[in-house]
Regions:
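A short helix->beta-strand "capping" segment at the edge of beta-propeller domains
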Residues: 14-31
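Beta-propeller fold detector
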Residues: 23-26, 67-72, 109-113, 153-157, ...
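Beta-rich, blade/repeat-based domains predominating
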Residues: 30-43, 73-85, 116-129, 159-172, ...
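Conserved beta-strand positions in repeat-built beta-propeller and related beta-rich domains
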Residues: 46-52, 88-94, 132-138, 175-181, ...
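A short loop-to-beta-strand structural motif that recurs across blades of beta-propeller domains
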Residues: 55-57, 96-100, 140-144, 184-187, ...
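Short loop/turn segments that connect beta-strands within beta-propeller blades
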Residues: 60-64, 102-106, 146-150, 189-193, ...
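Solenoidal tandem-repeat scaffolds enriched in leucines and small polar residues
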Residues: 124, 133-144, 152-155, 159-185
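Blade-level signature of beta-propeller repeat domains, shared across WD40, Kelch, NHL, RCC1
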Residues: 295-332
Length: 332
């Protein structure tokens, strides 16, 4: 296994044009932990869940309108994704199911887990083939839901308390995910359901969220040590860069823009910092405080190509939008 430590490099911020412009809206339901926004491909509504408020909701950016759909007490939804038909699917994190919401009627269809131990659906992503891959952190599993039949298949991790967490799906429908309780990244063959794991060199490493660039490289934030990591699955080689805020950074939410730049949030500092890293230059090029709220903690975020924006929810009860400057328009 090859480990390369790279020197951190934070470029000077642009002087003639901001790299990032952040706007926040206060969610009208107090202390509800709005999180994991997802852009509806049919309406451009921003769907999100209230983990502490037991709801699914959407936000209309143009009118600043919020609409809420109630869930049963104790569901504590953790994540939401919206399919090509505009149907939201949520992870019932404390209720052992994945739910499908009909926005027109409010009707919810529940897909229960086949194993009572699979109690906490966590982070989900479509596979592009009529299914949803999802992690189950405390159940120590990763699952796949067939959206048409409702069949759920589960794969157990090899280590106890591996805690599969952040998850992405590649263009072939194959899931890749972090094992937050260990120093491992992993993937599952969608045809055989065979688990393959990759050890990270540092035993103390704890990858939490991740992204995957089109060249097949896996990027992760090491939450415990304060590093950005690059894993080449073909060779197992790992390169790491110290985060701008160092060991206290606690990198959490992560996404990738349409220029394959990596964005993540340092949650160990207040206000939280939205940081950009360019794999082309191997440099951190942007560092923006999440203001005015400070955010508390940003746990997950998504990039919307149409508006060149990153959407996120905050523990301080805001929904946020960060408009990103394209590489060619940045002025150093």
């Amino acid at each position: 296994m090859l480990l390369t430590l790279a020197l951190a490099a934070v470029a000077a911020p642009p002087t003639a044009r901001d790299t990032v412009k952040i706007t926040e809206w206060t969610v009208p339901w107090e202390t509800s932990r709005p999180r994991d926004p997802y852009v509806d491909p049919t309406t451009n509504r921003i769907w999100f869940v209230g983990q502490a408020g037991n709801y699914v909701a959407y936000f209309v950016p143009g009118s600043a309108e919020f609409k809420r759909y109630e869930l049963d007490a104790g569901v504590n939804p953790h994540n939401i994704i919206v399919d090509a038909d505009g149907t939201p699917w949520y992870a019932g994190n404390r209720a052992g199911h994945i739910g499908k919401l009909d926005p027109a009627t409010g009707k919810i269809t529940k897909y229960p887990m086949p194993d009572p131990a699979a109690r906490d659906p966590h982070t989900m992503m479509f596979d592009g083939k009529g299914g949803i891959w999802f992690s189950l952190q405390n159940a120590n599993m990763v699952g796949h839901l067939n959206q048409k039949t409702g069949e759920v298949k589960l794969v157990k991790m090899t280590r106890p308390n591996a805690r599969p967490y952040g998850l992405v799906v590649d263009e072939t429908g194959q899931p890749w995910f972090c094992e937050f309780g260990t120093n491992r990244m992993a993937t599952i063959d969608p045809k055989t359901y065979q688990l393959k794991e990759f050890d990270l060199p540092a035993e103390q490493a704890r990858p939490r969220r991740m992204a995957r660039t089109p060249d097949g490289i896996i990027w992760y934030g090491d939450y415990s040590r304060g590093f950005l990591g690059r894993l080449d699955p073909k060779t197992g080689a790992v390169t790491e860069w110290p985060m701008p805020s160092g060991a206290r950074s606690l990198p959490y939410a992560m996404t990738m823009d349409d220029q394959n730049r990596i964005w993540f949030v340092e949650t160990g500092v207040q206000p939280n910092l939205l940081v950009g890293f360019d794999p082309m230059t191997e440099k951190f090029f942007s560092k923006t405080p999440v203001l005015p709220s400070g955010a508390g903690t940003i746990r997950h975020m998504v990039y919307d190509k149409k508006t060149r924006s990153i959407w996120f929810g905050t523990d301080s009860n805001q929904l946020g939008k960060a408009v990103i400057t394209p590489r060619g328009e940045m002025i150093p």
